[in-house]
Every structure is written in C-alpha cells, then in structure tokens.
C-alpha cells in the first residue's frame, strides 16, 4: 500500500497557501495555481507544512489523499521553481523556431507545422534542433510536450522524429534478405 499521503508537503519560503473550504490556492514567485480538493480528503495547514488525510478509512479516500498530496506538491514546486521539458528534433532538415506564443516546426512534411502555445506555457529554442517548454503547471507542460512530440514521434529504424531529451528510442534492425 502506498503511503504518499503520510508525507507532509513542506512549503518553501515565498510560497503562500490559502485554504477556503475545499479550494486550495498556491501563490509563489512564478505565479499562482488553484485546485479543488475532493470531499473525501482533509487538508491541515501547520505553519509551513501541509498535511493530507482521508476523512474516512475507505480505500478510495486513502488513494485520493495520496493523489491530492502529489498534485499539491507539484503545484508548490511549479510556483516556486517551475517545470520544464526538453525536446530534441532528430532528422535531416528537422528544425524548430519559437516566435512569441507560436512554435514553428519543420518536420519533413510538405508544409511547416505551426503550434500555438497555451496560456501559462513558454517555449524557447536554444538551438534549432532543441525545444525547451517551461511553465508552472506540470500537467500542462507535459501535455504541450506530448502534443509537439505527437507531430512526428521517433521511429525505430532511423530514430528520426521529435523525442524527449531523456527518452531512449528502441532501435530495430532493418529487414535482411
């Protein structure tokens, strides 16, 4: 059985948390996030520590307490240090260029791919084959990275495509005669 909810969330300096009933607001130097907590989960704030517990002993309540603790911990990390995901473009002529709230990608199609970045997410291109996506919401940063990767996922024969920087692509051998 997981005991994630038993670990308290320690609030770093500069992070402010407000509890209004089942609503939790987390504010930090990078921005603010809010989350609605399920009725089965109880949250207690003690100075700079948040504690999570299930209101009853039901299995689902305990699971929700652990999930809520993990989500709030991600919110606290996001508003204090932020989240980032790195993507690499591998392939001849594969390029990326960030222009404001748009990301222009050349991925071997007959047309350039233009990706509109959602509010709260920024992208920068340190080189024309690297994309760094940053934001305060971990789920949103991961979603944007997954959507960009989905345009041209890495293929197993040559390894061409858009991949996460830490991703290992399983390579296959070409068919032999």
UniProtKB/Swiss-Prot annotation:
Q: How does it assemble?
A: Part of the 50S ribosomal subunit.
A biological process from GO = cytoplasmic translation
Listed name of the protein? Large ribosomal subunit protein uL6
Basic and acidic residues bias (residue ranges): 154-171
Citing just one GO molecular function, the answer is: rRNA binding
Similarity field: Belongs to the universal ribosomal protein uL6 family.
Recorded GO CC terms = cytosolic large ribosomal subunit
Does the UniProt entry include the keyword Hydrolase? no
Instruction: Report residue spans for region: Disordered.
Output: 154-177
Domain of life, source organism = Bacteria
PROSITE patterns (alphabetical): RIBOSOMAL_L6_1
Role? This protein binds to the 23S rRNA, and is important in its secondary structure. It is located near the subunit interface in the base of the L7/L12 stalk, and near the tRNA binding site of the peptidyltransferase center.
Q: Which residues form a coiled coil?
A: none
Q: Which InterPro entries match?
A: Ribosomal_uL6-like, Ribosomal_uL6-like_a/b-dom_sf, Ribosomal_uL6_a/b-dom, Ribosomal_uL6_bac-type, Ribosomal_uL6_CS
The entry's keywords: Ribonucleoprotein, Ribosomal protein, RNA-binding, rRNA-binding
Which SUPFAM superfamilies did the record assign? Ribosomal protein L6
- Which residues belong to the signal peptide in this entry? none
Pfam families listed in its UniProt record: Ribosomal_L6
Keyword set includes Magnesium: no
